[in-house]
A protein has these predicted regions:
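Gly/Ser-rich oxyanion-binding loop with an adjacent helix/lid
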Residues: 1-50, 177-179
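C-terminal nucleotide
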Residues: 35-181
């Protein structure tokens, strides 16, 4: 399964032209019903986080928005993150990926980042923290906290990483207006 995921990622890189990560491929190969998949993209270690819904239901909505990563800003976002990392590495050579960057790094050395690179780096730091908090919420069966973190994740994607679209923003805003979601 891991080899299939890695081959699929390489196909995206070489034939599609998108320097994507491996999360989607891993989710397809290793996802199991009733669980979220927490993936460490550095080590490729993963764990399944059981989702106990109780009286809740999980609803997925197809926005009907079609896109290809080659025509989106995906590669540009990768470049912006890599640029931020290269600047921060001047202060801390032990940094390997943006995952290693802490809020302290950003506070102390972020002045040398352009505003866009700073925003992208800040998003990655916060999103990594949210993933861990979301797993803790699932383990504690705290679905309200989990839902709040999902909303925060969307806000970060929309405003800090700038990869959302009007249709998704509309759907998220519509769900927020309901007392039942």
């Amino acid at each position: 399964k891991q080899e299939v995921a890695e081959i699929a990622q390489l196909a995206e890189h070489h034939f599609v032209g998108v320097k994507c990560g491996i999360m989607d491929q891993y989710a397809c190969m290793f996802g199991i019903e009733g669980h979220a998949l927490k993936l460490d993209c550095r080590t490729l270690q993963y764990e399944h986080q059981k989702i106990i819904l109780g009286d809740y239901q999980l609803v997925l909505i197809d926005s009907k928005v079609k896109h290809e990563l080659t025509s989106t800003e995906y590669n540009k976002r990768r470049e912006e993150c890599e640029r931020a990392l290269s600047v921060l590495k001047k202060y801390d050579p032990a940094l390997v990926t943006l995952r290693d960057v802490t809020q302290d790094h950003l506070t102390n050395f972020g002045k040398d980042l352009d505003p866009i690179a700073f925003k992208r780096c800040d998003y990655v730091i916060k999103e990594n923290r949210r993933v861990n908090e979301a797993c803790q919420a699932l383990n504690a069966n705290d679905l309200q906290l989990f839902g709040a973190l999902i909303y925060q994740s969307h806000e970060g994607l929309a405003h800090d990483y700038e990869v959302s679209c009007g249709e998704l923003n509309f759907l998220v805003d519509a769900t927020r207006k309901s007392d039942h979601i």
